[in-house]
C-alpha cells in the first residue's frame, strides 16, 4: 500500500546517496540493523535496497525518482561494473521478483517485530488503565495515595525549579513517606525513564504534557525505592549518538550468506589418490567450525576412527551418520581416544577447551596426545603445553594454512612443533587432510611461522581490496583488472579468488574476517615483545578492525573491500 508520498514497498526507484551517482533500488521494509540508526534528516526518508551491492540505507524522498520514468536519464550515470550489475539485477527483479526473496530475509524478520510506536501506545494505555483502576479502588484521597497522586508527585519533583545554594532550602515531596503504589504504574514510570531514545522521548513528553501540563526543566528523576519512599536517583544516561552524517550515507551491512552444509557423500580426488593407510589409534576432534568440518570429513573418509564434540550438538549429527562417535564433553573425548585434536576459533576458546569446566584437564591424560590446531600465539601454546605435560600427556601444535575449500579437499599445509613422536603418530591424519606437513622443532615455532604467513596474507588482501576500490572509483572495470593481474607474475590463487568475490559483492566465508584480524593482532603482539616495528601490519590491522566493526566479522576476509570502498 502506498503512503502520502506515492511510494510503496517493492516500488523500483533511482536513489541518490551523497557521493554517489543515482543507483537502481527498491523501496523496502527497513531491516533490524537499519532501524537502529537514528535518522536525523529534515525531509522524510525511505528505506532503499540497492541492487548490485545488496545493501540498505535511509534516503531522503527528494533524492528518490521512479525507475522507469527516469531510466533513460540515469542509465549512463556510472561506468562501474557494480553499477552495470545493479542494472542487470533490477531488470531481473522486474521479470522474476521471487528470485530475490532470499536477499530480503532481514526485511521479513523486521516486519514481524513490534512497531516502536505501537509498543509506546500499548505502554501509554497501560498507564491510563492503571490510573483508572487505582482511582476506582482507592478514591481521590491523598492519604490512600492513588496512582494519579504518584504521577503528580513524580512530575512535581522533576519540574520544580532549581533552588540556589544561597537559599539553603530543600525541596520536599508533599506526599506521605510510605506509599502503596500500583506495581504496573511504577514499572511504567521506570520503563519510560530508562527506555531507549526512540521510545523514551515520547514517554517523557507524555508524562510532561499529559500529566503536569507543562514541560519540565532537565532535573534528576525522582524514583520510588523498595520501601516506597521517593528518592533522588540519577537515571542511567541515554546514549545520544553524535550527528555523524557519513554513517547515514554508508550502506548497512549485508546479511552473511549461510555456510552450506558439508557434503558427506563425496570424497575429493586428492584424498582418493593418496591410498592412505589409516592409523589404528582412535582420534578425537573438538570443534566443528568452518575448518573443522572439512578436516573431520577427510579423517572419516580415509578410514580413521573419530570421536567428535562441538558446542552446538546438531553439527555432530552428519558425522555420526557416517560412523563418528559423539561425546558429551571435551573431557569425555580425551577419555575415549588416544589423540585429541582441537580446532576452535581463538586463543581464549582454546584455553577454555583445556582449563574450562569438563575440559581436557579434567580427564586422565597419562599417555594421551593433544594436538592444538587453533590459530594461537606462542604464549598460549606454551601454557597449554605445560598443562598437558604436567598431567602425563604429550603436546603438539599443528597450525593449519589454508581455507575452507582446502580443508574439504584435503590440501591444507600443516606446520607442527612439539612432541616428535606424537607428530609421527599423526602422520596418517596429516596425510588425509593436507598435501604437506612440516615439523619445526620446539613448541612455539609453528605458531610463529603461522602468524608470519597470516601477516603476508592479510596485508596482501587489504592491498587488493584498496586497489579494486580505486579501480571502481576511477571508472575501470574490476573484471579487466583481474584479467590483467592473472597474466602478471604477481598473480596468485588467493588474489584471484578474493578478487572475484569482491566483483560479485558476495562474501561466503572461507576464512572469516574476524579470524584474519585476530591473527594480525597476535602478530603485532609477538612483534611488540621482540621490539620489532610492523607499521604496515598495524595499518592493515586497523582496516580489518574497522570492517569488523561495520558488521562484517563473520563474512569472508575479502569483505574488507567494503571498508575500502565506502
UniProtKB/Swiss-Prot annotation:
Belongs to the HIBADH-related family. NP60 subfamily. It is found in: Chromosome. PANTHER family: CYTOKINE-LIKE NUCLEAR FACTOR N-PAC (PTHR43580:SF2), OXIDOREDUCTASE GLYR1-RELATED (PTHR43580). Binds to mononucleosomes. Interacts with male-specific lethal (MSL) histone acetyltransferase complex at least composed of mof, msl-1, msl-2 and msl-3. The keyword Nucleotide-binding does not apply. Transmembrane segments: none annotated. SUPFAM superfamilies: 6-phosphogluconate dehydrogenase C-terminal domain-like (SSF48179), NAD(P)-binding Rossmann-fold domains (SSF51735), Tudor/PWWP/MBT (SSF63748). Residues 127-147, 206-234 are annotated as: Disordered. It holds the Pfam family NAD_binding_11. The PWWP domain is a H3 reader and strongly binds DNA. In the dehydrogenase domain, the conserved NAD(P)H-binding sites and sequence similarity to plant dehydrogenases suggest that this protein may have oxidoreductase activity. However, since the active site is not conserved, the dehydrogenase domain seems to serve as a catalytically inert oligomerization module. One of its GO terms (cellular component) is chromatin. GO terms for biological process: transcription elongation-coupled chromatin remodeling. Keywords: Chromosome. GO terms for molecular function: DNA binding; NAD binding; NADP binding; nucleosome binding. This is Cytokine-like nuclear factor N-PAC. May have oxidoreductase activity. Residues 9-70 form the PWWP domain. NAD(+) binds at residues 284-298, 518. InterPro entries: 6-PGluconate_DH-like_C_sf (IPR008927), 6PGD_dom2 (IPR013328), 6PGDH_NADP-bd (IPR006115), GLYR1_PWWP (IPR035501), HIBADH-like_NADP-bd (IPR029154), HIBADH-related_NP60_sf (IPR051265), NAD(P)-bd_dom_sf (IPR036291), PWWP_dom (IPR000313).
Amino acid at each position: 500500500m502506498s503512503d502520502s508520498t506515492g511510494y510503496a514497498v517493492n516500488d523500483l526507484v533511482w536513489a541518490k546517496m551523497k557521493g554517489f551517482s543515482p543507483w537502481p533500488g527498491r523501496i523496502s521494509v527497513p531491516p533490524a540493523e537499519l532501524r537502529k540508526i537514528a535518522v536525523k534528516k529534515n525531509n522524510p526518508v525511505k528505506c532503499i535496497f540497492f541492487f548490485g551491492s545488496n545493501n540498505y540505507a535511509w534516503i531522503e524522498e527528494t533524492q528518490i525518482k521512479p525507475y522507469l520514468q527516469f531510466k533513460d536519464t540515469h542509465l549512463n550515470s556510472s561506468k562501474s561494473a557494480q553499477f552495470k550489475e545493479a542494472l542487470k539485477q533490477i531488470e531481473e527483479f522486474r521479470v522474476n521478483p521471487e528470485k530475490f526473496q532470499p536477499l530480503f530475509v532481514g526485511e521479513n524478520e523486521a516486519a514481524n517485530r513490534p512497531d516502536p510506536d505501537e509498543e509506546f501506545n500499548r505502554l501509554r494505555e497501560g498507564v491510563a488503565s492503571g490510573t483508572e483502576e487505582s482511582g476506582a479502588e482507592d478514591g481521590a484521597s491523598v492519604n490512600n495515595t492513588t496512582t494519579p497522586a504518584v504521577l503528580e508527585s513524580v512530575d512535581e519533583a522533576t519540574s520544580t525549579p532549581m533552588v540556589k545554594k544561597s537559599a539553603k532550602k530543600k525541596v520536599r515531596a508533599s506526599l506521605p513517606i510510605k506509599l502503596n503504589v500500583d506495581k504496573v504504574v511504577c514499572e511504567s514510570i521506570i520503563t519510560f525513564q530508562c527506555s531507549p531514545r526512540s521510545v523514551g522521548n515520547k514517554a517523557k513528553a507524555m508524562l510532561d504534557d499529559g500529566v503536569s501540563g507543562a514541560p519540565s526543566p532537565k532535573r534528576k528523576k525522582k524514583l520510588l525505592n523498595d520501601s516506597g519512599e521517593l528518592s533522588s536517583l540519577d537515571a542511567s544516561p541515554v546514549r545520544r549518538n553524535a550527528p555523524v552524517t557519513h554513517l547515514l550515507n554508508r550502506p548497512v551491512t549485508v546479511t552473511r550468506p549461510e555456510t552450506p552444509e558439508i557434503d558427506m557423500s563425496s570424497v575429493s580426488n586428492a584424498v582418493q589418490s593418496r591410498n592412505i593407510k589409516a592409523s589404528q589409534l582412535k582420534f578425537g576432534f573438538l570443534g566443528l567450525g568452518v575448518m573443522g568440518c572439512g578436516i573431520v570429513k577427510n579423517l572419516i573418509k580415509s578410514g580413521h576412527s573419530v570421536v567428535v564434540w562441538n558446542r552446538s550438538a546438531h553439527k555432530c549429527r552428519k558425522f555420526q551418520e557416517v560412523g563418528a562417535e559423539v561425546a558429551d564433553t571435551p573431557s569425555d573425548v580425551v577419555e575415549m581416544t588416544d589423540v585429541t585434536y582441537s580446532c576452535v576459533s581463538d586463543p581464549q576458546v582454546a584455553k577454555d577447551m583445556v582449563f574450562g569446566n569438563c575440559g581436557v584437564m579434567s580427564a586422565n591424560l597419562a599417555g594421551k596426545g593433544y594436538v592444538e590446531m587453533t590459530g594461537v600465539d606462542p604464549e598460549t601454546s606454551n601454557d597449554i603445553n605445560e598443562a598437558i605435560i604436567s598431567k602425563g600427556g604429550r603436546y603438539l601444535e599443528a597450525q593449519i594454512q589454508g581455507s575452507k575449500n582446502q580443508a574439504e579437499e584435503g590440501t591444507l599445509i600443516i606446520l607442527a612443533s612439539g612432541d616428535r613422536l606424537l607428530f609421527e603418530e599423526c602422520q596418517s591424519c596429516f596425510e588425509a587432510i593436507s598435501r604437506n606437513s612440516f615439523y619445526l622443532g620446539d613448541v612455539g615455532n609453528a605458531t610463529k611461522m603461522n602468524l608470519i604467513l597470516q601477516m603476508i596474507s592479510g596485508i596482501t588482501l587489504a592491498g587488493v581490496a584498496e586497489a579494486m576500490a580505486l579501480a571502481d572509483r576511477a571508472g575501470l572495470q574490476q573484471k579487466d583488472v583481474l584479467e590483467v593481474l592473472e597474466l602478471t607474475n604477481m598473480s596468485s590463487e588467493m588474489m584471484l579468488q578474493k578478487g572475484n568475490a569482491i566483483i560479485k559483492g558476495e562474501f561466503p566465508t572461507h576464512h572469516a574476517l574476524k579470524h584474519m584480524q585476530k591473527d594480525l593482532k597476535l602478530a603485532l603482539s609477538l612483534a611488540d615483545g621482540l621490539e620489532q616495528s610492523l607499521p604496515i601490519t598495524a595499518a592493515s590491522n586497523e582496516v580489518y578492525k574497522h570492517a569488523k566493526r561495520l558488521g562484517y566479522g563473520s563474512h569472508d576476509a575479502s569483505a574488507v573491500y567494503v571498508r575500502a570502498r565506502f
